[in-house]
């Protein structure tokens, strides 16, 4: 039997999974690593620790001595790394997608009326979230970086490119269309790096990787006496779209990981949002480029980690389930989880997190429930924005670590007033990487074949009388007040 390898490089951990041809998990390993918070709004990663987490999870998979015929890489998007073209040595820590240090730069470009130009070409808004302003910051703030870049001696990559570079021994500098589409430098209409965007952000073209389809031949890597072709690379949220088999226009998924990302397949042409959502590339498989609309929420699992590590409300994330109210009642307590600003559809980089409505009677359960509801309320805002853009939502497929919490899934269904579909394996990004690589290698004949294969799903249906419209209205008023305070 042939086997597929998925390298799933996430914001706080790396996971490697071996699948058989029917996409059953054969073996997996996971390794966490720390993020670095040098200043308010700054989030970094040590490139060496990130790379070490990949090898620590990859080597046990290779040690199985199975016939792994291809590998796929999926990765946290937008996180920005710059390294020496000859030695591979990073010039500084990686700047993580959550980092907001370039807010002033983005605001200055908005003042020059450049946001509409950027949005028309990239489908993205002007926000520190995306890679371009992060590259500019590195070139302008790391000593000697700009001169080295202009001399052709530096390379930029999102995490996929960085991993491919190192796995290939520094011989391959490529990315795929999904990761390129998150940089604010890639024109999603022409499928090329855009000269005007490079000029706006002052980034030399020589730094950038070659852009390929998601199921391209990305070369191979040799490790532990094995040579494995890499036939798939795809950003993690797009990989979850593939993993959930969202191959038809209108298919939609939401991934609840470090952040939360709702994505709907919008077909073969880009659809511009009028409601604060992003137009992006969903995937390019078997030649066809499928586009997507996306709503990005910056904090999801991060909220639970903060309640655990900083507030010490519980010892492990699973214990948060015990403190989550079954009915979603938080006794007037509200929470805005803007640790690094707020994402779609509001896009405010300055606002910060806050609780509201705390009294002497407020309990840990009230605060934990308010925190979970703050995520659900953001999902409702994105659902409403999608409907304003003409997307008719009948149900929602979900995945990611948080959806193993049955109480959360039930409340999500109650408040969204939708059926929630949870797959048996909630790690859709890893499955998507395996599917992408399998298509690239020729193991799967068609996307529809994969979609029609039976999958076990758990379905949560909304209960009557749980959603509190007044509580949602108060939460929205509180968010608007905070955005005014931090204006």
Regions found by a protein language model. Give the residues of each.
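Gly-rich Lys/Arg/Thr-decorated short loops/hinges at beta-loop-alpha junctions or inter-strand turns
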Residues: 34-44, 117-118, 174-181, 359-366
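Phosphate/pyrophosphate-binding loops at sites that engage ATP/ADP/AMP, CoA/4′-phosphopantetheine
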Residues: 54-69, 142-149, 166, 195-205, ...
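N-terminal phosphate-binding loop and adjacent alpha-helix
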Residues: 29-67
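Glycine/Thr-rich phosphate-binding loops that ligate phosphate moieties of nucleotide
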Residues: 1-30, 37, 69-112, 146, ...
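Gly/Ser/Thr-rich active-site cleft segment
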Residues: 9-11, 118-237, 300, 304, ...
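Active-site nucleophile and cofactor-binding loops and adjacent substrate-binding regions
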Residues: 23, 45, 70-75, 95-98, ...
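ATP-dependent carbohydrate kinase catalytic cores
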Residues: 178-288, 292, 298-302, 315-322, ...
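A polyampholytic, Gly/Pro-enriched intrinsically disordered region
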Residues: 111-127, 228-233, 251-253, 439-453
């Amino acid at each position: 039997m042939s086997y597929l390898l998925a390298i799933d490089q996430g914001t706080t951990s790396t996971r490697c999974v071996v699948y058989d041809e029917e996409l059953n998990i054969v073996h997996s390993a996971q390794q966490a690593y720390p993020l670095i918070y040098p200043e308010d709004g700054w989030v970094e990663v040590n490139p060496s620790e990130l790379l070490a987490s990949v090898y620590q999870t990859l080597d046990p998979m290779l040690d199985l001595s199975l016939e792994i015929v291809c590998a796929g890489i999926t990765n946290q998007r937008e996180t920005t790394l710059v390294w020496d073209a000859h030695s591979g040595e990073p010039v500084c820590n990686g700047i993580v997608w959550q980092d907001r240090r370039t807010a002033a730069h983005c605001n200055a470009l908005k003042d020059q009326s450049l946001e509409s130009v950027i949005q028309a070409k990239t489908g993205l808004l002007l926000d520190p979230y995306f890679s371009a302003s992060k590259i500019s910051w590195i070139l302008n703030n790391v000593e000697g970086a700009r001169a080295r870049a202009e001399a052709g001696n530096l390379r930029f990559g999102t995490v996929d490119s960085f991993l491919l570079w190192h796995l290939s021994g520094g011989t391959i500098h490529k990315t795929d269309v999904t990761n390129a589409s998150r940089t604010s430098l890639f024109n999603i209409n022409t499928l090329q790096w855009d000269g005007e965007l490079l000029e706006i952000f002052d980034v030399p073209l020589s730094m950038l990787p070659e852009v390929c389809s998601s199921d391209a031949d990305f070369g191979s890597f040799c490790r532990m006496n094995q040579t494995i072709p890499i036939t798939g690379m795809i950003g993690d949220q797009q990989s979850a779209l593939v993993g959930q088999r969202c191959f038809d226009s209108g298919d939609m998924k939401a991934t609840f990981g470090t952040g939360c990302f709702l994505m709907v397949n919008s077909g073969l042409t880009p659809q511009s949002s009028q409601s604060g959502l992003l137009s992006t590339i969903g995937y390019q498989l078997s030649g066809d480029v499928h586009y997507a609309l996306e709503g990005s929420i910056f904090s999801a699992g991060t909220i639970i980690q903060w309640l655990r590590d900083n507030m010490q409300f519980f010892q492990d994330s699973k214990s948060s389930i015990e403190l989550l109210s079954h009915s979603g009642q938080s006794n007037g307590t509200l929470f805005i989880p803007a640790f690094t600003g707020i994402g779609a559809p509001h896009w405010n980089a300055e606002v910060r997190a806050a609780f509201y409505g705390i009294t002497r009677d407020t309990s840990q359960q009230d605060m934990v429930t308010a925190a979970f509801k703050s995520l659900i309320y953001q999902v409702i805002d994105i659902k409403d924005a999608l409907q304003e853009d003409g997307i008719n939502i009948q149900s929602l497929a979900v995945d990611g670590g948080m959806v193993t919490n049955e109480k959360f899934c039930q409340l999500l269904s109650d408040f969204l007033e939708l059926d929630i579909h949870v797959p048996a394996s909630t790690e859709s990004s890893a499955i998507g990487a395996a599917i992408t690589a399998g298509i690239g290698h020729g193991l799967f004949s068609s996307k529809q074949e994969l979609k029609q294969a039976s999958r076990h799903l758990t379905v949560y249906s909304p209960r009557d009388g749980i959603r509190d419209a007044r509580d949602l209205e108060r939460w929205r008023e509180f968010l608007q007040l905070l955005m005014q305070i931090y204006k």
